């Protein structure tokens, strides 16, 4: 098998500029994801008063410890219903991704009732359709954590 060669020059100015720009974008993305977590966590007192776990705590307890969880669609609904980039909360009131439960790779879908009481939006519908299509193609079981 032939070895792949690269023309990327990590020491070049253009590479360094591109890398710096990309890292800034990743930091911004992560700050938007954190906005979603913070918005959900504002309801922690309500969950505790009801004797409930938060959506992320339920997810954490479901997943196999030490195994990866690949979250998907974390930017769904961003600036859709609320066009203000400074206050819009991404995520479409759901946490979805692929993780391992009892050693089995699964699609996990958690309704995040900490955001807008878990109300489904049009974007939530797009997310659910997308992940269910992935599950069919990849033959993944689905676990849906619902709070009603």
Locations of regions flagged by a protein language model:
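Terminal-region recognition feature
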Residues: 1-148
